[in-house]
């Protein structure tokens, strides 16, 4: 979600070299900060990866402007290759560093594999761009070759044979998912967003297969298995129905009944047995026992149900306003769309403070519900398909240019990923010290508070625009200030947070991510929490 001055946007092919350079400068600042903190051969690989991604990004941008890319990408943004390429490698580096400090060699190696996998899929995206660019850019190829050679050489001497095979497995899955999903979902992603989303899905799928084949009794937390199975199950379900409805009219009652029946068959016949094998107990009974285990969980579930009802009422109210409006193209204003950010903040903060495992599972269930409802809307499944199309069209923006509406799913992911990605085995009593204690709040701070306040103040009072963008200086400054106030409130209400005088790093992290929000054209609901998570965990 973005904040804008009331001025016309540049066309999709308009060059935004100033904003792209500023975005790159912010990303390089993050990379160098992590490099200075970690300072090992893997962080040097991250620097080399960032340099080649910076040069290749311009080739992707030219391909998008000329319409020469292999697939149809979202045209209202630049390629976003540089910021997306660095997320998985940097995340792996900070995870490795934290687990090394905690004396957990297994998850230290896991962090290295995450970093190596992120570098592999990023290099593949760069090679793809140069392979379809005509004439072949010799200088950029040399830079890519040098950076890739350094990374491959270091990883060859750092990874075991099994780890190399794991990286190659993820890369293979990533290639196939790119070919399938980018064909089925034109204009839903930029190259960078595809790299980030499909790379993450590929890694999750490979982890699930690996853990299913090497299962050991009592190994792993059931909530982790629950997340893996739900994500993979929903993706495979979407691919199955997309292929099926190529040959069927999805809008008929017969197809709708078949959709619901097949959903039940896949859930009861594939997903639940798969989860049962992993957790060694009845998944439904485990979930019910988990959700209603304590009085605190019952109170939180009741509170969240009220907030969900409130969100539905907001949607109904905005659609009622559209029905009474003379314009058929009435769109919800920026402030109305930010209501959902405030509702999500009110949802996540009590969960983080009182019961993070419950929030972990509840966010997973909510993700499955959101994706399922998007399938119903996309395939026009009766009886809710057309209703959802009408209701959700009110909240579209320029980033929902493809057949899928992903903004609300990205918002949920941005808030949930800091909860899901905490390396719990490498923490003391489930929390980290210093600035790292704010890691679970990264989504709340970056998107729930920062982006919301920036949008409201930037669109209503903003006058001074950042060069090359529609974002405003006033919006960014109020965003930083609001996040600082939020950190102070977290210190007051969450007794488990001890910042240990790391205030300068927190301020720098918040300011850096706010500047990234000002210049990026990617999905900030997803990108900003990940960068704030990386900086806070470093």
From Swiss-Prot:
InterPro entries, alphabetized: Polypren_kinase
EC category name: transferase
Cytoplasmic membrane side: 35-74, 133-134, 185-188, 246-254, 319-337, 381-401, 458-472, 517-538
Keywords: Congenital disorder of glycosylation, Disease variant, Endoplasmic reticulum, Kinase, Lipid metabolism, Membrane, Transferase, Transmembrane, Transmembrane helix
EC number: 2.7.1.108
Gene Ontology biological process terms in this record: dolichol metabolic process; dolichol phosphate mannose biosynthetic process; dolichyl diphosphate biosynthetic process; dolichyl monophosphate biosynthetic process; protein mannosylation; protein N-linked glycosylation
Annotated consequence of substituting residue 441 to S: In CDG1M; 4% residual dolichol kinase activity; fails to complement the temperature-sensitive phenotype of DK1-deficient yeast cells
Transmembrane annotation, as ranges: 14-34, 75-95, 112-132, 135-155, 164-184, 189-209, 225-245, 255-275, 298-318, 338-354, 360-380, 402-422, 437-457, 473-493, 496-516
Outcome reported for the amino acid change (mutating residue 304 to C): In CDG1M; decreased dolichol kinase activity; fails to complement the temperature-sensitive phenotype of DK1-deficient yeast cells
Span list, region CTP-binding: 459-474
Any one GO molecular function term: dolichol kinase activity
Effect on the protein of changing residue 475 to A: No effect on dolichol kinase activity
GO cellular component labels: endoplasmic reticulum membrane
Superkingdom in the source lineage: Eukaryota
Lumenal compartment segments: 1-13, 96-111, 156-163, 210-224, 276-297, 355-359, 423-436, 494-495
Tissue expression remark: Ubiquitous.
Topology versus the membrane: Multi-pass membrane protein
Family note: Belongs to the polyprenol kinase family.
Associated pathology: Congenital disorder of glycosylation 1M: A form of congenital disorder of glycosylation, a multisystem disorder caused by a defect in glycoprotein biosynthesis and characterized by under-glycosylated serum glycoproteins. Congenital disorders of glycosylation result in a wide variety of clinical features, such as defects in the nervous system development, psychomotor retardation, dysmorphic features, hypotonia, coagulation disorders, and immunodeficiency.
Comment field (misc): Complements the defects in growth, dolichol kinase activity and protein N-glycosylation at the restrictive temperature in yeast sec59 mutant cells.
Stated name of the protein: Dolichol kinase
Organism: Homo sapiens (Human)
Lineage: Eukaryota, Metazoa, Chordata, Craniata, Vertebrata
Gene from which the chain derives: DOLK
